[in-house]
Amino acid sequence: MKKKLLSITLCLTMVVAMLSGCKTQKEPTNGENVSTEAPKATDKPVDTATPAPEPFEITLGIWPEDTLPDDIKLHEGYVETFNTTHPNVEVVPAYYKYATDTFVPLAESGKLPTIFESWYTEPQKLIAGDFVADITDILQERGWLDAINPAIKELLSKDGRIYGIPRDGYALGLMLNVELFEEAGLVDANGYPLYPKTWTELAETAKKIKDATGQAGLCLLAKDGAGGWHFSTIAWAFGATLTLDNGDGTFTANVNTPEAISAMEFVKSLKWEYDVLTPDPTNEDWGSGFVNLGTGTAAMYIAANDAVNQPTQVNGLPVDKLSLCPLPAGPNGDQFSLLGGTPYFFSKDATKEQINAALDYLEIMGKAPVATDAAIAGMRADAQNRVNNGVPVIPRFPCWIDEQVLAAEKQIITEFGNVDTKLYDSYYDATTTEGNLRMEEPGSAQDLYAELTKVLQAVITDKNADVASLMEKANTNYQTILDGLKK
């Protein structure tokens, strides 16, 4: 029951906040006189140094990957600003993309970055493993503790202590390559894509696109756990609940229900009846999905508002040829958007001084619950970098509840908006509707996704695969994992 209340609280809070941030934007500025580098800070971040500060370093797992040179330049501007108030701190770039198979070895070797990102499914695992620092007292001293969305704070806490802060949130939707919709003639009189409202319509739309363009209608993931992650949203639309919370710290696998089986049968039909998928979904992962969408080899892909840079900046899709719409509804009209997000964590080996320095860096980035001149400068620099790189400047899901921060973000979106908001309105309309947002399944979501991906791989590669038997096996395997959680 506690988890249900948490989910409801989080969803309602998101809805209220998003309603204030999704209005139609004015025409974008040309950006000619706006620097892409972070301006000098006007407000000095919290000074935790002693009168004669000892030198130390912080390693930034949040540093951009090498393939994003403009993002690196943006961070170099942040570092320049940071150095004006932290001359004794050396900033060491240490890009790290969280993955369940690399994290534990990295943590056990003592090589975790000072600050790094993860997923909202992971906090309790990281806390239980003693991999991340307790930052409760530090946040209290900075006045940040009560600025976090209460429901998100609970996700990042254990026994009243908090171990992380939010970067942002997301809600899964359906990304569209508008160029392929145009080529297939699937646009309305005003040129906007005719996106599918139901999963059956998605299959039919995907078939029309493949017949007209020769490209895949949908990129389905079936290589790793991301496949099961995406499938869970399809299953919900078909009426499934994949894990039951027993309310006593135990969970029951619910993968073998008629609703879940029906959803998997539908996915199987996308391959063997409609034939609308990319050549080998078992080689498709989160990143390759954006490659397909951005380069025009797939017309639709399940993705979220926090990843609009992937098809555009990373893979070359023009900023005005991307659209984001709601996930389709199921046979009974059920329609949900999986709600997740990215938290920041800090290595358990980091000192208080290192953690405070990393938090100061987040403030300069504009990722803190403050609306200082330094923070707003960081927000503006980030928005200008998006404009320069053809990335949509659109509202994010708010994880902080400070009104000044929310107002500053809204103003920046209005100032730097660079897309036709009608390409995104349906997504925001859906995700700000009460009851639409749904938290990831309780229990052990990543293990659930892994089991579901095994089934996806089977039904995609074997036309005669017995879906019911495969789902029964997945249910048994997942229940074994759930039973071990309390041991």
Where are these predicted regions, by residue range?
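Conserved N-terminal structural module of periplasmic/extracytoplasmic solute-binding proteins
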Residues: 4-8, 22-129, 140-146, 188, ...
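C-terminal motif of bacterial Sec signal peptides marking the signal peptidase cleavage site
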Residues: 17-21
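Short, solvent-exposed loop/beta-turn-alpha elements that line the ligand-binding surface or hinge
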Residues: 50, 133-148, 191-195, 240-264, ...
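Alpha-to-beta junction loops
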Residues: 89, 107-118, 131-133, 214-216, ...
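Short helix-initiation/N-cap motifs at beta->coil->alpha
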Residues: 94-102, 197-201, 280-295
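Hinge/lid segment of periplasmic solute-binding proteins
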Residues: 119-182, 197, 201-205, 213, ...
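Glycine-centered hinge/linker elements that transmit conformational signals in sensory
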Residues: 201-208, 249-281, 323, 327-330
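C-terminal lobe and pocket-closing loops
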Residues: 307-317, 333-338, 345-450
